[in-house]
């Protein structure tokens, strides 16, 4: 009788776990996915957007953070098989562009717009071949700054390189426009982080407004915990994981 009861309980627990239907999510991106600035800013790890999502979806979805700081779509393509396809998730968040758009030498971005588009399409098409549902995300706005006091974007990148392009903020958003276009053309759900951040700063899209919003840290291109909450809310409001 005792053995029968134990067997019954084991079967009950197993059936319950199967019924809950655990699903996997991979968050694939750069430092704003990884939360690379959390350590040196001393932000609470629980307030990274991926971790907020993990907490909210605990018991429903297992979520893997596959963000690596400093990476472009070209870098990410090299690890797409191991970090995404081999994980066999149901959903895939894709957030790149900040490093692709960076101009380091000779006035050229790290990844051209054409190649950036090709890489996004590759991620989407390969995901779908493996039964994975891709979700695109735009990158956050840039606080340009004036290059002084080791603050904001122009303290690390040359403002002159971005002047012909209308400034770093406009240039970065032009990569987001590619993400938006790919989302529309390939019918991929989109979390428009850029749009949500600008709405949260009052719709002004200026350095002053973005600084006052508290959404972006002193680097000028990394989010704060307050910004991470905006990303999470964009996912939840769009019911992205229920589609």
Curated annotation (Swiss-Prot):
Residues carrying lipid (N-palmitoyl cysteine): 17
Signal peptide extent: 1-16
Lipidated residues (S-diacylglycerol cysteine): 17
Recorded superkingdom: Bacteria
Topology relative to the membrane: Lipid-anchor
GO molecular-function terms, A-Z: hydrolase activity, acting on ester bonds
Coiled coil ranges: none
Membrane-spanning intervals of the chain: none
Compartment(s): Cell membrane
GO CC terms: plasma membrane
Record keywords, A-Z: Cell membrane, Lipoprotein, Membrane, Palmitate, Signal
InterPro entries for this protein: GDSL, Iah1-like, SGNH_hydro_sf
Record's protein name: Uncharacterized lipoprotein YqeF
